[in-house]
């Protein structure tokens, strides 16, 4: 288990959301690209903050940083710690997901869904952030990065994880 005590940010802050988004991109890269977490983290961090995409294609946290330039260090800290912790605890996290997604094998899930669930499960089990806020932000990630059914799928599985692990909503 990791010794990280969670983010020292307010719930639903741009920094926390950006940290999750960078973590998601890095986990996705590790999952589908078969690259080491530190390499994925560095690439995703650089791409997130140095994007040349048009503003309409940026996520809300990314647009915030492009407009203000504030909170970058806090976001990087969250992403780095979260990626390291999830990489270390991935087997335990996947076991929790597997138990709560009775009709879906993790290997059958889309990589984006699988990795949003890993982030959400990690945060729910650690209890750093209120469960409702974790689920809300994971659903927002699913809306931006997933297909049409992805937000409902993420919401349902994370809600089941809360029920199965006696996590108050």
Q: Which role fits each region the language model picked out?
A:
Residues 1-151, 155-169:
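N-terminal interaction/assembly modules
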């Amino acid at each position: 288990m990791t010794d990280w005590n969670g983010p020292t940010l307010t719930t639903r802050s741009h920094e926390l959301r950006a940290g999750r988004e960078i973590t998601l991109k890095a986990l996705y890269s590790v999952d589908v690209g078969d690259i080491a977490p530190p390499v994925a983290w560095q690439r995703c961090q650089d791409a997130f903050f140095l994007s040349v995409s048009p503003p309409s294609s940026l996520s809300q946290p990314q647009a915030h940083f492009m407009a203000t330039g504030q909170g970058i260090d806090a976001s990087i800290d969250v992403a780095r710690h979260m990626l390291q912790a999830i990489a270390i605890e991935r087997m335990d996290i996947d076991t929790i997901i597997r138990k709560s997604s009775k009709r879906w094998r993790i290997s059958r899930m889309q990589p984006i869904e699988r990795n949003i669930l890993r982030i959400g499960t990690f945060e729910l089990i650690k209890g750093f952030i209120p469960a409702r806020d974790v689920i809300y932000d994971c659903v927002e990630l699913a809306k931006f990065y997933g297909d049409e059914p992805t937000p409902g799928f993420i919401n349902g599985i994370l809600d089941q994880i809360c029920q199965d692990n006696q996590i108050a909503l």
